[in-house]
Amino acid sequence: MELVGRIETRPVEGARDLDLFVKLPFRLPEQRPNRVPPLLTDEREFHDPKKNPQLTQCDVQRWVAWRDGKVVGRIMGIIQKSYNAAHGERTARFYNLDCVRDADVVHALIGATEQWARSKGMDRMIGPFGFSDKDPQGLQIEGFEHLPVIATPINPDWLPPMVEACG
């Protein structure tokens, strides 16, 4: 658990925390007007090691951010060991970054992931980037007036500058 300002980041531990993590995007206010939420069954399967073998082949850590007793964000850190070995890298990835409109929350979540990555010997972090290039990656930076298409990043327009400010 890490406390940054009023924001507390807690690692996801156990089924109850994972359920909260998976359902969090459905509870967040202030998302983009044309937002189409992911299918809950797809989200559950993505985070189920019985359905997604990447979860057993990578180092993965998830966090939920809290402020004043309320859930305000989530993020997942990934170390894709086989990719790093094949490319001679020590790169971590962040993924599933969803939160309320608050730069402090974004900073706390990315900071927790960065600290975890360093503790695992990583010297670089990229994201949003999932397990592979088959997962939606990156941030949408324009075209928010249009409905999203399948397998593309879906984020509010205020998120990219907040992520960029984290370095």
Features from the language model and the residues they span:
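Short aromatic-glycine motifs in intrinsically disordered, low-complexity regions
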Residues: 1-2, 151
